[in-house]
Amino acid sequence: MSKVVVITGANSGIGLAAAKLYESNGYFVVLGCRDEKKGLSTEKEIGKKSKFFKIDMTDYESINNFYDNLKAEFDKVDIFYSNAGIMYVPFSITKEGHESTLGTNYFGSSYLTLKMLDLMKDVDNSRIIQISSIAMYFIKEMRYEGLEDETIYSPWTWYNYSNLYRTMFSFELDRKINKLKTDVAVVHPGVTRSRLYRRSKPTLGYRIIDKFKTDVSTGVAPVIEASTTSSLQKERVYAPRIIHQYGKPSTYKANKLAYNLQERETLWNYTLDKIGMKDIL
């Protein structure tokens, strides 16, 4: 049986590029997408060694349905690439009561990641890959209060928090499951020419960033490296080598908060309480 890789946000950008590369290397690719039309179109594009399952990362019922469908068809997963994410969106609250950026990028991702362990924990060299961003560096202190408060909401700041929290959660998860056969890695693909930035306003800062965007093929390389290397570097972020933006994959240190074990444990407990999975590990 082929190795199985599951990708969320698989119908565009880095997710789509990764899906194509995995398929070309013999993997069966499960495409997790919110938009059914786009998901089915991607399945057709990838070919017979792929299957689309609908998922909305803001909705735990949708995530549960996705997982149940996955488990009904596959008895194991070799790679889970948690890629789905949004940025610079107007303030809104999800069905689960989270601000939408954090609800999609962090809480939904964490919820699905923990569920995926059941299909991965006994699989040799299985790997969870979490998308992140150097945006995490802009955060200097942890925040737990007011995350659903529209009066203090900042699209960029909440996006930055979502990436820091995702990184910290991943490092802590990897530490907690060190006796299982599954490893966890974090990837920053660089600022690429993808649909993630489609809602960004044409500010001076954005126009400067736009000049330095790299192509998707450069961005996907760290994903493939982190998911297939036989010598995974723990508690490092895989990214393009040159200023985390250009060149071949390398690794670098995360925000220093990600190495604070007390802060990680606090975030871990806070997260499991918010997503209703206190007894998962």
Show the residue positions of the predicted features.
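NAD(P)H-dependent oxidoreductase Rossmann-fold/reductase module
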Residues: 1-73, 78-80, 85, 136, ...
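Conserved internal alpha-helix within the Rossmann fold of NAD(P)-dependent oxidoreductases
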Residues: 108-113, 127, 166, 219, ...
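Short glycine-centered segments of the SAM/dcSAM-binding site in methyltransferase folds
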Residues: 28, 125-127
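Residue(s) in the substrate-gating loop at a strand-loop-helix junction
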Residues: 133
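Short alpha-helical oligomerization interface
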Residues: 90-104, 151-152
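Carboxylate/His-rich catalytic cores and anion/metal-binding grooves
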Residues: 130
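Conserved catalytic-core motifs of eukaryotic protein kinase domains, centered on the activation segment
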Residues: 90-94, 123, 140-142, 197-198
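Amphipathic alpha-helical dimer-interface segment in Rossmann-like NAD(P)H-dependent oxidoreductases
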Residues: 71, 104-124, 136, 174-175
